[in-house]
């Protein structure tokens, strides 16, 4: 009988679940004003974060005016240090009423980074996901390219090996030109030049290529030209953050 008296805590007396906030970051440290004040205010209320790199996340938080003590008041978990099936571990405190923020290394979380797995888990558990407004290099490049903004595909990083990359570029070109679907991709800054060389070698001269570099920064440049025109003046993109788009 004593066991029957022991009941689980009524749902009405449990703390409401917290929320998962998706926090935008800079596209480069030369334009810190790009983060809206509303985002800064919201981030200031949080004390638990999921990040790719703790050091750069702390630097970012300080840059936007975050004042809490990282040693005594804040928990920062690096997503890559928790092995497989990480979402239940990293989001456990949400069920206790705590809000948690995901911070990307650049731009918005969950695009070309591992945060999407956490968001997928959050939805499966009925956790509210709140995306905060911030810069997206992909969308900024698209709207400034002059290419089709109604149908487009983002491919992330193309293959590293040159032969595989050129094959992929030909495939993307075929889709862009036959169906007028803008093809968007990116590369790590130190491989930009090799990607451009492959593109100029394998793509048709009439194919349109947009190169968008250093978006939101003082050194920003965005240009859409035919491949034949790019060949006349090959851009130097070494160590510049770039987005590439192909159009028909």
Regions found by a protein language model. Give the residues of each.
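Glycine-rich, flexible N-terminal cofactor/catalytic loop recognition
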Residues: 2-78
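A contiguous loop/helix-start segment that scaffolds small-molecule binding in enzyme catalytic cores
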Residues: 2-21, 98-99, 178-248
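Short glycine-rich anion-binding loops that position phosphate/pyrophosphate groups of nucleotides
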Residues: 27-28, 105-109, 189-190
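Short active-site oxyanion
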Residues: 43-49, 126-130, 182-183
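Conserved helicase motor
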Residues: 76-84, 158-162
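Ordered, amphipathic secondary-structure segments that act as subunit-interaction surfaces
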Residues: 96-114
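Short Gly/Thr/Asp-enriched flexible loops that form oxyanion-binding sites at enzyme active sites
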Residues: 109-125, 199-200
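Class I SAM-dependent methyltransferase SAM-binding "motif I" and its flanking Rossmann-like core
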Residues: 117-175
């Amino acid at each position: 009988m004593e066991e029957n008296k022991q009941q689980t805590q009524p749902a009405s007396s449990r703390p409401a679940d917290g929320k998962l906030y998706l926090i935008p970051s800079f596209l480069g440290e030369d334009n810190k004003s790009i983060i809206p004040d509303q985002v800064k205010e919201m981030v200031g209320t949080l004390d638990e974060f999921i990040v790719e790199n703790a050091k750069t996340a702390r630097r970012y938080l300080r840059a936007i005016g975050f004042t809490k003590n990282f040693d005594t008041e804040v928990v920062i978990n690096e997503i890559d240090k928790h092995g497989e099936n990480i979402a239940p571990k990293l989001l456990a405190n949400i069920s206790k009423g705590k809000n948690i923020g995901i911070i990307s290394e650049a731009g918005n979380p969950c695009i070309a980074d591992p945060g999407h797995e956490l968001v997928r888990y959050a939805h499966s558990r009925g956790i509210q996901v709140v995306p905060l407004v911030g810069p997206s290099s992909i969308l900024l490049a698209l709207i400034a390219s002059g290419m089709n903004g109604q149908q487009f595909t983002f491919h992330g990083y193309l293959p590293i090996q040159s032969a595989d990359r050129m094959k992929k570029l030909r495939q993307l070109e075929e889709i862009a030109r036959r169906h007028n679907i803008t093809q968007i991709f990116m590369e790590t800054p130190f491989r930009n030049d090799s990607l451009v060389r492959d593109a100029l070698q394998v793509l048709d001269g009439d194919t349109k290529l947009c190169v968008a570099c250093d978006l939101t920064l003082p050194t920003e440049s965005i240009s859409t030209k035919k491949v034949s025109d790019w060949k006349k003046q090959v851009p130097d993109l070494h160590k510049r953050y770039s987005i590439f788009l192909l159009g028909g």
